Amino acid sequence: MLDVNFFDELRIGLATADDIRQWSHGEVKKPETINYRTLKPEKDGLFCEKIFGPTRDWECYCGKYKRVRFKGIICERCGVEVTRAKVRRERMGHIELAAPVTHIWYFKGVPSRLGYLLDLAPKDLEKVIYFAAYMVTWVDTEARERDLPSLEAQISVERQHLEQRRDSAIEERHRKLEADLAELEEQGAKADARRKVREAAEREIRQIRDRAQREIDRLEEVWNRFKNLKVQDLEGDEQLYREMRDRFGKYFRGGMGAQAIKERLANFDLEAEAEKLREIIRTGKGQKKARALKRLKVVSAFLNTRNSPMGMVLDCVPVIPPDLRPMVQLDGGRFATSDLNDLYRRVINRNNRLKRLLDLGAPEIIVNNEKRMLQEAVDALFDNGRRGRPVTGPGNRPLKSLSDMLKGKQGRFRQNLLGKRVDYSGRSVIVVGPQLKLHQCGLPKQMALELFKPFVMKRLVDLNHAQNIKSAKRMVERARPVVWDVLEEVISEHPVLLNRAPTLHRLGIQAFEPQLVEGKAIQIHPLVCTAFNADFDGDQMAVHLPLSAEAQAEARILMLATNNILKPSDGKPVTMPTQDMVIGLYYLTTMKEGAKGEGRAFSNIGEAIMAYDLGELDLQAKIKLRVEGDTVPPVNWEPPEDYQPGQPYILETTLGRYLFNETTPEDYPFVNQQMGKKQLSALVTELAEKYSKVQVATTLDALKDAGYYWATRSGLTISISDVIPPPNKQQILDKYEQQAQKIQRQYERGLISDDERRQELIHIWTKATDEVAKDMEENSPPDNPVWMMVNSGSRGNPLQVRQIAAIRGLVSNTKGETIPRPIKSSYREGLTVLEYFISTHGQRKGLADTALRTADSGYLTRRLVDVAQDVIVREVDCGTDRFLWQEIGERRPDGTIVRKHNVENTGFGRTLAEDVVVDGKVIATKLSDTTEALIDKLLAAGVTRIRIRSALVCESKIGVCATCYGRSLATGKPVDVGEAVGIIAAQSIGEPGTQLTMRTFHMGGTAGQDITHGLPRVQELFEARVPKGVAPISEVEGRVRIEETDKSRKIIVVPDDGSDEVSYQVPMRAPLLVQDGQRVEVGQQLVQGTVNPHEILRILGPRAVQQHLVSEVQEVYKSQGVSIHDKHIEIIVRQMLKRVNVLESGDTKLLPGEMIERPKFEEINRRVVAEGGQPASARPVLLGITKASLATESWLSAASFQETTRVLTENAIHGKSDPLLGLKENVIIGKLIPAGTGMPQYRNIRVEPTEEAKASMYSVSSYEEPSEYTFGQGSGEAVPLEDYDFGSYNR
């Protein structure tokens, strides 16, 4: 077999008949599968052992040769080679067809490649292939021209002959009529009888005339058709064709079916055709030019590759190996078989019947029908259902053809190549393990024993607890006591991977050190739940075991939970104390007025703890405490006058706060404040930035332990009586009810419109709700458990408390519009029937939304991953001098400079493109990382915008460079070469997708257009779709004139430079953003609404469209409170703008209208210019992520994404080769991915031994030393035991 590591690219092309025969190990001649009695394969059938290899290892069909010692012998009785049975997975066969057939992909795909090549409409092509019309394949024009006069003479002679025959027949009839009439006259018949005879004669004469005329017309028709006959003419009239062939058969040839197509292809002159098409493109216009371009693409594909167009017509069909289309016996003695076997059987049956008919010399019409059926059978085998009705199996189920095997989620690509089942894995329900350290997980004993079985068995043998592997296995299966001790030993320091589906981002798989636990549930650390999005209501998780030392090292260094504290999407910590822990720490750090022991002073912490233990001091009482000098004072602490650092000092604090500070690192300043969720978040962020991973993990564990400990002791409970309703609710509502009635009266009098009434009512009731909520908050005691939860941030928010305690407020209906009457009851009071009904309405919609959203969001992630999967950091610096301007601050009206609100997602973690110089002094040097500190320093120096590097300006040929990408947000350090930043970007954008809304909001009632928000808006942007209700932007600089008629409204821009004015038709109701007479810039938006990104690209260029897309996507995520760094969106946008569309081809081989990647285009141009030619011109195009994924250089990646058959057809014709640069391609063929430790520069490292090592290696071993070769000769490859040959040992 081919070793996957020894090739760098993979080419796809068209197989010729010779290729197919070369792959084949024999011809399949019979449709039989296996013998019903012996259950052995039939000879020459679809499972034949002679062709495909033996069904059992080292055993021929007849049983003459058994055992491995006969390896390679071909049995003379049955012709089967003695070898391994697994060759039945790789040996192919073939079927020699009695008549050629066309390949359905190339004839039926859109566009039809065969049709483009031969310049035939697919309808006509179908007529020829399926024997409904004849096609002329060759005309001897010279001979025809030469013999035309003599042929014409022959025809005219024949015509005269026909005319003479007609005239004599008519004359004959006339004579007979005369005789008949004379006879009747003699007999004295009546006039009536005479009239009848005369009429009959006239009728016959008319018939003679008509018949003759028809013959003459037919002759004329045949002659005219022949005179103008040219290659590729179709003739559907069989009679006419036959007559033409009988008369002028030596001047032309024609045929039906694939044979005719094959002849046509054999004589097809590609070069001449290409020249002709280029001429049309140079001179032609419109439709004609467009068609010529499309045809030239196909023609030049065959010209420039090794493919022959003959490959589109097959003389033989390959038969895939039998183990890939197996036949298995079910319990009931019946057989289950792959659909392919049925499809192959139909092909073989029809092929054999056709052979027999040809041998018998059957009439042409019968043979043609059989040929058509053979063509249809092969079509069904390749792609069932592509043409006509699909072939169905039992129960009217369409059979799965070869194409279906590749397509879709269940196809070969997505089911078996990109995702595989993993050995050494298990899954179980998860429960919380509060006693675990951050890097640990609890693994059930039974599960651990099964996972680590081989390790335990080996260790048992090493420790002499078992004699051999077999007895060790028995010991493990019987779970002897010694086994558990060995398991403990084996398991220590051996990390396992835990994964929770759906794995939306890379934190969905993390490594932990297993701890053995009783029971059957996996225990996980409470702090990693956020990353996994896990809860303990029945979630399950999977465990995987890294086997090799390298895998264990990578799991420990890169994937251990303690190394994954920051979120890759925005660099914020993801392991945060939540819920119980927050409430415990909040309780611990609260300072309570008038608590027991308030105002006392303690000389050291021991005294305070003793007082607490004796019940003399409350945990939350305000005390004075003498603190040792090695404790860093609080940040804003003002020291006494003669204070020296290192001296003890006195702090006003509580015992609880001191205990809280025991959890933080030694040198962290004393925290003397109440710690809620926000404060804890800030604390963890600071720790992650300034301290080592070990210290952060220790602190987090200490915080977790303290949180649970004090949450337990806080005695926090909740009951309905803790929900305190606001005392003045009724008075407030009455006051606003009067205002509402006033508005209603104004409306009834017609003073305001319905729209205004709605707006006013909504405004009034919003104010009322807010006032009731305020009243509620003012009347809630600080130690109220419900409010403690809300204020600490551990659970719930004021809105929810408001709905339970005070007032439900305004709700929306199913359309998403707000209903202008509020729900005045709270949940505590209970809702009336009407209130209940209108509130369930909106909530039900919300639930339905969530279900749809999950699917949509998953598909978006899949497309994003696909478009960005080959963006890997490939080099340290691409050396570009391009940059982006990034705002980091804004000037207030009073002159002070403040930070821009979202700097942490725009300017933070970037690389400076230039030195920042203020007043001749360099504040920040080029290529430095913009940290929080540096941004503050720049703002202090009065700098509000900086030049940064970004993925959008990176000039790396493949992937991006580390400098342009900047800091890796997951580690807080500069990104490493080999980081798969494209995948991280896709995950960061896709993971919060489920949190986005689905709705289209309505702007105030009926008027105004709908604005797309949430997930649909993100999809619209990434797919580069033209939005609904698109707003025009000005193409020129100038003044605006607005013209309105009754029906329409126009905005006209009069350019300053006096060129033609540009007019834009806008909807009557659309709100304008410009006034009459206003000056507008190029690219300024004229109407409210969404802008078409393609227009921005056309008018303002790539940079503007990049910034538009990034900011618009950010808008959606920001509105939902999701924080994502710009660099992730920039990577996706970079992929969307990677290609250019060729306008003029110059002297290059490119075709106008062709899409090509920019670096490749520039390189082609450079080459042509160097040779003194004319370069090509192109314009940038914006592709949606689906289109961009399908347009990738890698055909493997595109085929495994969507439209598999189309991608493979297209790329096979162009003979594309896949450079294997992305991740997917390498996963598919089973190579190491070129990212992370799989990068070549990390793989190609050799460790040189030291001099001593070399010396000891080359020294001669003395006889006491064991010999080096204790094992037999052979490779160091592991041999599976069941395959190992133990000589004559009879298994």
From Swiss-Prot:
One of its GO terms (molecular function) is zinc ion binding. This is DNA-directed RNA polymerase subunit beta'. The keyword Zinc applies. The RNAP catalytic core consists of 2 alpha, 1 beta, 1 beta' and 1 omega subunit. When a sigma factor is associated with the core the holoenzyme is formed, which can initiate transcription. Belongs to the RNA polymerase beta' chain family. NCBIfam families: PRK14906.1, rpoC_TIGR. Keywords: DNA-directed RNA polymerase, Magnesium, Metal-binding, Nucleotidyltransferase, Transcription, Transferase, Zinc. One of its GO terms (cellular component) is DNA-directed RNA polymerase complex. The keyword Zinc-finger does not apply.
